[in-house]
Structure formats: C-alpha cells, structure tokens
C-alpha cells in the first residue's frame, strides 16, 4: 500500500501496518448519520466480478487519481446527490484499473486488446514444487466448485423465502381489501365522505419540476461501469432514507445497462425532472434512539429487508378479526372446591380468574381486602357464583374420607383368626397364663413381676391361629385395658380362685361390656389349697356375669397357669366362641387397624405395635397412624422374625414411621405420600387447636389467675416424664392426676417416649421441673448437663415406686396444718408506765397458766383487740418462764401499749403439723 496512487513501489508507512487484501476486493469508508448531528465512519468492502470468458473481458480505463479520495469522503447529506464530476473521456483500451487498485505491487503495463498475457514458464521450479503447485491448483478448483454449489443453494433459499414473503403480502393485501369491503358494506353512510375526499391525495402533477443533470454523479453512475471502486457507493440502508435508496436502485439498473455498452434496456438517457425526495420528519423519540431494533426497522412500510414471521402475522390477523367481529371468548364454568376457609389468591387460582378482578368485586361490595386475606366459605361461594362457577363445599375432615371403614363385598371376605384380650386384676396370673399358652416366660422380664406394657402375641391351636393381647392389671393402666377391649373379639376374664373378684376385675367386666365383646371366665390358681372356684362364680353374679354352670351363657374354665391344667380346654372354648361369632375379613385390600403400643427405640427409631384388622400390610406401603405417617420399612413379629406381609388379626411391629403415634390410634394405608402428609397435617392442626384451647381455658386472663391463686392457693408440682412406651406414659399421667387435691396438683410439662436428652434438661430448667425416667436412661451428655444445671433426674421401673415418691414430694408442697392450744387467761388489774420499758400490765392469772414466748390476745369487751407475743413476764422483779393460776405478774406486749384496766389477756400455743396426701 502507498501514500499516493502515482507511486507504484511497495512501501510501508510508519503509522500503518502491512496488510494483504484478497483479490477482487475494494475497500472504502463512508459516513453514517446517527441523528442529532452525530456521524460514524463505516468501512465498506465490495467484491468485483471476474470475467468468465475471454471475450467478456472489457478494456478498463484507469481511474482518476482523485476518485478514491473523494469516495472516502463523507457525504454531506444522505438525500443530496454528490458534487458533479467531469464527464470521463471515451473508453480507451488502457490497463485495467481494478487489478491495479487491488494489487498495487504489479506494474501497469499498457497492452492492446488483442494482446493476451503470455504464461510465464518457471523452469527453475523443482518437481516437488511443481507437484505442490498442482495440488494447490486442484484444491483451489475444488473450493471454487464448492463455493459455486453453496452460492446456488443460497440463491434457491433466498428465492423460496422471497416467494413465501410475497405470498404472505398478497394474503395480507387480500385480507385488507376484504375487510375494507366489509366495512364499507356495513357503514354506507360513513363511506360517502370518504369517497368525496378520495381525490385529494393525488398531488403528483402539482410537484415542481426541476431540470435533472444530464449526467449523474460519477459515484452513482459510471459510463464504464467499473471506474470507481464500490466503496464509493454506500450499502443500501446504511445512511440514506428509503427514497434515496429507491432512486439509487433505479440508477443502478441504468448502470447495469450502460455496462453492457449502451443505454439501459435500449433507452436513450435523457434528462428527467428531479423528483423531490420526501422525508418523514423525525420525532424526539427517533432522534434519541440510536439503536436499530426489529420493532423499529419496519417503519411506515419501508423495505428494510425484514418482515414479520408467519406466526406473528397469523396472530395479528386473528386479533384483528376478533376486534372487527367483536368476538368474546366463551366463559368456562368450573367446579370450585371450597374448604371452610380459603385465601382470595387461592380462590382466584381455583376459578382461573385474576385476583385483581376478585378484589374489584369485593370493593364494589364495600369490602377492602388483599389477595392474602382469608375468607370463609360463604363469601367464597358468593364470589364464585358471581363469576359463573359452581361450588362444591368440603370440610377439612374430608381428607380422611375413604381410608377407614371401607365396605367390602361379602364374597371377598374370608375367615380370620380371633383376637383375644386377657383382662383381670393385678397378680391374678394373666401373664403367667399367657406364658403357659405360648410356652414363654414373659413374667421374668417384667419389673416387679407385674405387667406394665400391653403386648400382642399369636399362637396356634389345632392348626388355627389365635391372637392374644395381654393388658396390665394395675389400676393405673385403665386406658390400656379399655384399648384392649375395643380392639378385641373375645375377652378372657382371669380371676384368682383364692382372691375372688377385685376392683380391677369389676373394671375389666365393665370395659368388656362397653365394647360389646363376649366374656370367657378363666378361674386361675385352682392348684392352691385355699382355692374356691364356686365363690368366684357366686361373686360374678353380682356383676351380671352368668356362667354356664350357673344357668347362664358365659363360658367358664378352671385352669392353672402353674401346672398347665385345662389350658387346652380354654383354647377350645376360645375357638368355639370364634366359630359362633363367624369372624371374617378381606385380605385383598388396603390394610387398616389399631396401634396397640408405640415406643421410640434408640436403634430402630419409632416402633409401633399394630394389630391389622382388615386387609394385608406389606413393607414399602405408606401408612398414616394418628398424626404421623411413614413408609413401612420392616414388619417384625413377636418372635423377632421379619415377615413380608401381615394379614387380618396379625400383630406386628412396624418400623419406618416419622414419629411415635399414640396408643389406640387408628392406622390405614394410603396411596401416596402427598395424601399421607395432608392427613397428618390435618390431625396435627386438630391436636394443636385442642391443646391451645385447653391451655387457654386453664390459663385465662391474668386477673383470673391471680384471683384463683388467692382464693384457692393451688400449688403445682411440675414434672417432665420420659417413658419407654406411650402406654406407660399415659398410665403414669393418669395416676399422677389422681394424686391432685384442691391445694396441690402435678403439672406435666412434657411427656414422651424415648430416652432423656439435653432438650429435656433445658425444658426442665426453664420450668423448674423434675425429670422422671420410666424404664429409660439419660445419655452421657444429658447427665453432665443436668449436673451442671442442678436438675434432678429420677429413674423408675415400677409404677408403684414412682407414684409413692411423687406423692411424698407433692405432700411437701402442702401448707402445714396450724393447730392452736389454749393455755390460760389473765385479768389486768393495773397499768404501770415504766421509764425505758413502756407500759406494763399488772395481772392476775385467773385460768390455766401464762408462759413466756407464747401467743397472746388482748380481749376488751369480748372483742379481740390485739394478737401478738409477750415481751416480758415478771413476778415481782424476776423474769419467769411461766406463772400459774392465782398468782400475780407483770406482762408487756411487743410493739403494743394500749392496755386498759379490766382487759383480759388470753395465752395460747400454736403447733404446725405436716400434712400428707
């Protein structure tokens, strides 16, 4: 590249870098108007065509030296023509300028048109170089062929896109014409002024004519067609408006015609009047907008090379058609499920309406609400009806519908084993009898030899299975006995032949009658010498239990758990009673049943002993038990075996629950985790509401609390109870509740199944409570924390000891009993005023005696005036401890001197006696 066109030598300036341009390329810069007086230099490159045939090659005249410089200058305005250039001389066969501009290193050698460049023979090339040249030539030819194929495909694609665009434009024009015709047909009155004003836009004849230059600007049109580089011509749409581009396109056609050696399309170029270029005035927004976007590219129908997509055009047509035909979308009426309470936002979502519309309706009704406000079902039903929807009202309890008490087809029901509950008084041999039946030794594992848990077992007799439920007999386990009676088919009432009917025996009879289950009386301990079975039968008559031997319908069997006598007869009686009851269940359905017992095991987590009453329970199923749910991880029998399924009347331990359910809760299998979570959350809400209502009912206002404390003086003994199973905790809570009196009661701050943890210690510290562990222990961290905080932890494994210790501790909270003992009376004979001592009463003891330090009352006219203690008691001048009746003495009161002659002084002794519950 050189600084001037005259210098043909290859040189590099100090400020420019040496670059090689591809052949056939010319480059220039133009100035693009950016608006508001701003311009930008744009580099434009143009590729020239090569002559494909030797006869098409035209002799090219050299370009004027100043032409490239002027081409690079910015145009003064996009709508004005370039300054007129002198008409170039006729074409003469001169060296081609295009090659000279593109390859400045080649010298310009004049040659005639009939002279052809002779090939240069390179004799000094080696064979390897010749082969490389041939390979390069072959590769170049292959690339040219590929480029030609690519260009052909590109032309085809452009032609197809142009056809699609023209078809869309034709469709749009036809649609607009049809719409215009429809509007004119519908509104003939409005069409008349439009027709009258129609000729007004025709102003082409009134345009001022101006002589057009005979020769256009060289930059716009060149006679030789290749004199100036393409950089002098800016790209379409770069800096000129649409009008100027249209004119230049026409001039381009003339250029192509002139390039073929004559006027364009055989016409003589004559001067034409210059058409005024109409430019649309720019608005402020367009002046500020310097960025070209798709939205702003197609303005007022200008042909900028972009067009809307077919999808956008269809959407636009559909929208316009709706607006013309005034179509309204069909209102969809939906069935809206309304709970007892719902937020406005959720209601609008269920109706598929906007929350704003719902709020507007409420504002019209005079209610100002927000989308997050909660409304009741009545208002929600009114809103849904206003919006044209139907309503289905449900309650929160409907989430439990369809999971319990599902009716079965009679043909699907098959016989199932009976569920037998062993009930009776404590120490009457219930567990020993069950051990003899199961050939096990459960009694040895029970603390104190008494049953404190409810257990479920299954035995087999003559090929038939029997499920036994063992209940505690202690008075504290009333709830356990009630649960056992409700979940059973047959109740075995165990009565000791040497002890006859006892209070828990009567309670068990009442539970069985309340549950409506038949009773089988097992008279135990007949191996003892003092046993009297007939006495037991006679006592049962008092409680409306009529055995068969006494003319009734209740079966009775005399058994001995120690020797195993008549155990087979007892099992036969159970099977006979089960056959009479005709017990059936459907194993081919989802399982449901009752939680017998639940505990928190350290290694296995929450463990629930359940009795399947219907259906079949399998691992992997999702169950809901009370307010907890979980996926069954394993099923364990009473013998410790893992089973794959548990059918009707089968007791198993279930592992995998999210929490520890309450004993006595119903459980059922549900289809999904979402349903289980929904039921669990509903039951948890119910439990929280009940607890809050109970606490609020107990708490009341501060004034009520103070009044109650002053009037009743009830003291509370706070406790934190942790047990091994839920049933034991329930029994302990019930037993402690019975210890309460009008003055003191036990308040259970927290109770739960599982070991004692640090959180229990923190809770006990905050509430100043003692911690009781029943068959559980505290971990090392909890013990250390309790020692640091000074919290007492007591461990028990027998409920007797627990109740006795709590009873003694609660007795200490009772205010001691104040017992007053009369000592004697003295009459005041004279009152003396002694310096430094005060008033001293001279008295005579008229009844009993007077003791120093005892309590005294000053009685005047049979009214107690003062009550206090004696300060001094003297006989003559000596201090004495007591003065008997008939003697005189001097007495002075503490902090009281209003004594008069004739007053009576009563002396008494006060004793405080400790009370017990």
Swiss-Prot record:
Gene Ontology terms: cellular component: cytosol
Region annotation Disordered: where it falls in the sequence: 1-327
GO molecular function terms listed in the Swiss-Prot or TrEMBL record: GTP binding; GTPase activity; guanosine tetraphosphate binding; translation initiation factor activity
Region entry G5, spans: 560-562
Region (G3): 470-473
Biased composition annotated in UniProt, kind: Low complexity: 63-74, 90-112, 184-209, 217-244
Keyword GTP-binding: yes
Pro residues bias spans: 75-89
Role noted for this protein: One of the essential components for the initiation of protein synthesis. Protects formylmethionyl-tRNA from spontaneous hydrolysis and promotes its binding to the 30S ribosomal subunits. Also involved in the hydrolysis of GTP during the formation of the 70S ribosomal complex.
Protein name listed in UniProt: Translation initiation factor IF-2
């Amino acid at each position: 590249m050189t600084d001037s066109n005259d210098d043909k030598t290859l040189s590099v300036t100090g400020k420019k870098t040496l670059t090689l341009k591809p052949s056939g390329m010319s480059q220039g810069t133009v100035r693009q108007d950016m608006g508001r007086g701003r311009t930008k230099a744009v580099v434009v490159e143009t590729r020239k065509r090569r002559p494909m045939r030797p006869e098409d090659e035209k002799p090219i005249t050299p370009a004027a030296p100043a032409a490239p410089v002027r081409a690079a200058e910015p145009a003064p305005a996009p709508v004005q023509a370039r300054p007129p250039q002198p008409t170039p001389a006729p074409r003469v066969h001169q060296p081609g300028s295009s090659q000279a501009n593109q390859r400045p290193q080649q010298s310009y050698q004049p040659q005639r048109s009939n002279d052809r460049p002779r090939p240069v023979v390179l004799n000094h090339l080696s064979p390897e170089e010749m082969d490389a040249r041939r390979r390069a030539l072959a590769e170049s030819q292959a690339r040219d062929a590929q480029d030609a194929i690519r260009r052909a495909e590109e032309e085809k694609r452009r032609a197809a896109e142009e056809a699609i665009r023209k078809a869309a434009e034709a469709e749009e024009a036809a649609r607009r014409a049809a719409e215009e015709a429809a509007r004119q047909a519908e509104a003939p009155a409005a069409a008349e002024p439009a027709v009258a004003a129609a000729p007004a836009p025709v102003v082409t004849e009134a345009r001022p004519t101006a002589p057009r230059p005979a020769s256009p600007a060289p930059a716009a049109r060149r006679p030789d067609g290749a004199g100036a580089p393409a950089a002098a011509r800016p790209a379409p749409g770069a800096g000129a408006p649409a009008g100027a581009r249209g004119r230049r396109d026409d001039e381009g056609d003339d250029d192509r015609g002139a390039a073929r050696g004559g006027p364009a399309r055989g016409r003589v170029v004559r001067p034409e009047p210059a058409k005024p270029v109409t430019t649309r005035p720019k608005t402020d927004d367009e002046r500020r907008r310097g960025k070209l976007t798709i939205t702003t590219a197609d303005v007022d129908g200008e042909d900028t090379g972009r067009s809307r997509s077919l999808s956008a055009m269809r959407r636009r047509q559909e929208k316009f058609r709706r607006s013309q035909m005034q179509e309204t979308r069909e209102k969809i009426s939906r069935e809206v499920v309304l709970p007892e309470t719902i937020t406005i936002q959720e209601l609008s979502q269920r109706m598929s309406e906007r929350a704003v519309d719902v709020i507007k309706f409420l504002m019209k009704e005079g209610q100002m609400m927000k989308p997050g406000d909660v409304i009741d079902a009545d208002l929600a039903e009114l809103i849904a009806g206003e919006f044209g929807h139907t309503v289905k009202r449900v309650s929160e309890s409907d989430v439990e519908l369809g999971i319990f008490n599902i009716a079965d087809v009679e043909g699907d029901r098959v016989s199932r084993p009976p569920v037998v509950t062993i009930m009776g008084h404590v120490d009457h041999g219930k567990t020993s009898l069950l051990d003899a039946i199961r050939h096990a030794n459960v009694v040895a594992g029970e603390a104190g030899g008494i049953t404190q848990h409810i257990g479920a077992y299954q035995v087999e007799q003559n090929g038939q299975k029997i499920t036994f439920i063992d209940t505690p007999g202690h008075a504290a386990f009333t709830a356990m006995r009630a649960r056992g009676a409700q979940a059973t088919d047959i109740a075995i009432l165990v009565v000791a032949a040497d002890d006859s009917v006892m209070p828990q025996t009567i309670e068990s009879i009442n539970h069985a009658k309340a549950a409506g289950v038949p009773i089988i009386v097992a008279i135990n301990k007949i191996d003892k010498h003092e046993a009297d079975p007939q006495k037991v039968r006679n006592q049962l008559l008092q409680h409306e239990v009529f055995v068969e031997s006494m003319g009734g319908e209740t079966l009775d069997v005399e058994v001995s758990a120690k020797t195993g006598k008549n155990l087979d007869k007892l099992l036969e009686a159970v099977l006979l009673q089960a056959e009479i009851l005709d017990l059936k269940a459907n194993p081919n359905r989802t399982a449901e049943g009752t939680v017998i017992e639940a505990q928190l095991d350290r290694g296995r987590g929450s463990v629930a002993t359940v009795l399947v009453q219907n259906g079949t329970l399998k691992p992997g199923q999702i169950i809901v038990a009370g307010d907890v749910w979980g996926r069954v991880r394993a099923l364990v029998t009473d013998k410790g075996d893992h089973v794959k399924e548990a059918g009707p009347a089968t007791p198993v331990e279930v592992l995998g629950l999210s929490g520890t359910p309450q004993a006595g809760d119903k459980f059922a299998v549900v289809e999904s985790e979402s349903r289980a979570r929904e039921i669990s959350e509903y039951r948890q809400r119910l439990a929280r509401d009940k607890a809050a209502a109970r606490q609020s009912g107990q708490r009341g206002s501060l004034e009520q609390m103070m009044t109650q404390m002053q009037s009743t003086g009830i003291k509370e003994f706070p406790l934190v109870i942790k047990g091994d199973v839920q049933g034991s905790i329930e029994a302990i809570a019930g037993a402690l509740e019975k210890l309460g009196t009008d003055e003191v009661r036990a308040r259970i701050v927290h109770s739960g199944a599982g070991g004692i943890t640090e959180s229990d210690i923190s809770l006990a510290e905050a509430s100043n409570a003692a911690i009781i562990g029943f068959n559980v222990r505290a971990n090392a961290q909890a013990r250390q924390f309790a020692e640091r905080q000074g919290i007492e932890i007591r461990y028990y494994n027998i409920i007797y000891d627990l109740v006795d210790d709590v009873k003694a501790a609660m007795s200490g909270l009772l205010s001691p009993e104040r017992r007053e003992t009369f000592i004697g009376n003295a009459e005041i004979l004279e009152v003396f005023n002694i310096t430094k001592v005060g008033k001293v009463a001279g008295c005579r003891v008229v009844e009993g005696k007077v003791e120093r330090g005892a309590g005294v009352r000053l009685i005047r006219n049979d009214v107690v005036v003062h009550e206090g203690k004696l300060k001094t008691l003297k006989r003559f001048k000596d201090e004495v401890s007591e003065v008997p009746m008939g003697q005189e003495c001097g007495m002075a009161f503490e902090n009281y001197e209003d004594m008069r002659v004739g007053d009576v002084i009563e002396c008494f002794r006060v004793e405080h006696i400790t009370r017990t519950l």
